[in-house]
């Protein structure tokens, strides 16, 4: 899980979603997991 100021899709399978006011990226590739913070 990477914590970043700006979350971006890193590949085609990445999805940007918002959970409880936190912007997250979920992906099949574990290295692409991110959240904003």
From Swiss-Prot:
UniProt keywords, alphabetically: Ribonucleoprotein, Ribosomal protein
Name the UniProt record assigns to this protein: Large ribosomal subunit protein bL36
Similarity comment text for this entry: Belongs to the bacterial ribosomal protein bL36 family.
Gene Ontology cellular component terms for the protein in this record: cytoplasm; ribonucleoprotein complex; ribosome
UniProt record, GO biological process: translation
UniProt xrefs under PANTHER family: 50S RIBOSOMAL PROTEIN L36, CHLOROPLASTIC (PTHR42888), LARGE RIBOSOMAL SUBUNIT PROTEIN BL36C (PTHR42888:SF1)
Pfam families xrefs: Ribosomal_L36
Organism: Aliarcobacter butzleri (strain RM4018) (Arcobacter butzleri)
NCBIfam families: rpmJ_bact
GO molecular function, one term: structural constituent of ribosome
SUPFAM superfamilies referenced in this protein's UniProt entry, alphabetically: Ribosomal protein L36
Transmembrane residue ranges: none
Entry superkingdom: Bacteria
